[in-house]
């Protein structure tokens, strides 16, 4: 929900080329570093073998279309983000991105129809029906933050919340082994809590100071997310027998946090961000 808020914000007053450049540089360079890190760790620890073709295919996030599996399963969320990027890019291309009331209402109706009637069946071709409520909510929260309260934003956010609760209840099977009603209810409550938190942040009821520590912690979450699963778990499994599970988990967590900070501080902040600023500045200079 937070990333979608930022994506919608980044679409404002930008051309298609500027938006595509911004999103590409935000998503891919760090992904490449983290793919290499995961390959390095799992090759050494688990003695896994990856072909160069599989690694390069994962660099694109289109690896499944090329017949290659994910090196790390967490990449599935990035593929959902790519679809969202594409939708926003199309809206910018046609100059209708600011007509939120029209396309957001259509999207919400289609999502509700798919939730209750599994129609239209083609919806999954261009956007995930299962995660559309979260995408819609993030845009609703952005409008709430930018334009203030309105009946439209309240309807969008509340409707998205209801659909998200239904989806959380249904999708608990994907994350929990044989979940009962209690586990499904907890999943729905966690989802509702994130909605309340986003409401509090966008309405100004909770204010976070723009200090470097908060910026750094927030920025570290992306690389940390990309390396924590396969690489992190493989290290814990490999060395927990020698040092104890708890001790190994703590050490690996600290290593992952440190590496994530290094990626943010020296790669993203030091190289990628200046490159993005320069390229977008050049695109604007040439009216692209």
Language-model region placement:
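Alpha-helical transmembrane segments
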Residues: 33, 104-111, 158-161
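Hydrophobic membrane-targeting signal helices
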Residues: 7, 42, 93, 112, ...
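Generic alpha-helical transmembrane segments of integral inner-membrane proteins
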Residues: 32, 36-40, 86, 90, ...
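Membrane-interface helix-loop-helix regions
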Residues: 2, 10-12, 16, 21, ...
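Surface-exposed cleft-lining segments at the edges of enzyme active sites
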Residues: 71-76, 121-127
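Alpha-helical transmembrane segments in multi-pass integral membrane proteins
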Residues: 9-18, 65-67, 91-102, 123-255, ...
